[in-house]
Amino acid sequence: VRCPSCGARNRIPADRWGDERAVCGRCKSPMRPTVLFPERSVPISDSTFAGEVLAFEGPVLVEFFSPRCGHCIRLAPVLEELASEYAGRVKFVTLDIERNQAIASRENVNGTPTLFLYKRGKLVDRVVGALPKQELARHLDGIAA
């Protein structure tokens, strides 16, 4: 697992994953699950996509959105609720496709909202449209396990 402070790779055994005392071996920063998997969505860009998503070893939900999209605006609070509920297990990130067109184009994102679910840097699920919270939770349960 990469340290969010210095980027060093750390090994955390599965039985110690939730241990609040876990620290980075290099910089001694906390390696708590809520530090690695925050309770809120993290905005990313074309330049940070690889590091925040592809290099991240845990599950990640990427929301491709447009600030002018009505469905995206209605989905945002649902995703924030889910980010809080899945804190420590799934990392939530958002990518504004109007400002970051390279990744959206490369990933063939044709409409918004589009959600990609990654695990260990690999795309494992894709959801197009604003689904109900319970359905999104079902998709998240599949990658959080």
Language-model regions: role of each:
Residues 111:
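Glycine-rich phosphate-binding loop
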Residues 1-90, 99-102, 106, 114, ...:
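Proteins that catalyze or organize thiol-disulfide redox chemistry
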Residues 94:
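Conserved residues in the N-terminal Rossmann fold of short-chain dehydrogenase/reductase
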